[in-house]
Swiss-Prot record:
Region annotated Flexible linker, chain positions: 144-156
Chain segments carrying region Domain I: 1-64
Domain notes: Has three domains with a flexible linker between the domains II and III and assumes an 'L' shape. Domain III is highly mobile and contacts RuvB.
Protein name stated in the entry: Holliday junction branch migration complex subunit RuvA
HAMAP family given in the database record: DNA_HJ_migration_RuvA
GO cellular component: cytoplasm; Holliday junction helicase complex; Holliday junction resolvase complex
SUPFAM superfamilies: DNA helicase RuvA subunit, C-terminal domain (SSF46929), Nucleic acid-binding proteins (SSF50249), RuvA domain 2-like (SSF47781)
Length: 205
């Protein structure tokens, strides 16, 4: 089990990052809420991970805090929720916001996320209510750990912020027309990819 990775952040293309640890590059998929908290390229980061072994692949999912990872682990234990949908849920809202949805029985917000229909949302609210009791306090005071050391200069990004944002939304399950419309509606000159992704997601919730 790989539970934590500490290394140099050498690639960032939402929702995936590449971290160099002693010459070995680890590809890690992250929810966008954690992705936003990452340091710049060339700096060192600590990422808490969940390791999944499948017949055709070995996958690492990464989180900025232990509490967010704990919530992800609870989510994928829910009926009908796999790692991909778990990442989508935590990309559309923070751990704290998800806890608030469960507390309020807020189906309307959950069904706005791609891949979450009414039945899935109802099932999530029922199954997660008891599981979250021990997690709620921890998620409010989540620790965020970064180790920033390096003078590495990152190469210039090839893709535009709009292209990056649309690609990130497509990876979360949004349709091309939805992604393009959301990005276009919030884009202003000078926006970074991360700010644009965050704004586009908020516009759809």
């Amino acid at each position: 089990m790989i539970g934590r990775i500490r290394g140099l952040l050498i690639e960032k293309q939402a929702p995936e990052v590449l971290v160099d640890v002693s010459g070995v590059g680890y590809e890690i998929q992250m929810p966008l809420t954690s992705f936003y908290e990452l340091p710049e390229l060339g700096q060192e980061a600590v990422i808490y991970t969940h390791f999944v072994v499948r017949e055709d692949a070995q996958l690492l999912y990464g989180f900025i805090s232990k509490q967010e990872r704990s919530l992800f682990r609870l989510l994928i234990k829910a009926n009908g929720v796999g790692p991909k949908l778990g990442l989508t849920i935590l990309s559309g809202m923070t751990a704290r916001e998800f806890v608030a949805c469960v507390e309020r029985d807020d189906i309307a917000t959950l069904v706005k996320l791609p891949g979450v229909g009414k039945k899935t949302a109802e099932r999530l609210l029922v199954e997660m209510r008891d599981k979250l009791k021990s997690l709620m306090e921890a998620s409010v005071g989540s620790e965020r750990e970064f180790m920033l050391q390096s003078n590495y200069t990152a190469p210039e990004a090839v893709n535009t912020a709009e292209e990056d944002a649309i690609a990130a939304l497509l990876s979360l399950g949004y349709k091309p027309a939805q992604a393009s419309k959301a990005v276009s509606s919030v884009y202003t000159d000078g926006m970074s990819s991360e700010t644009l992704i965050k704004s586009a997601l908020k516009s759809m919730l």
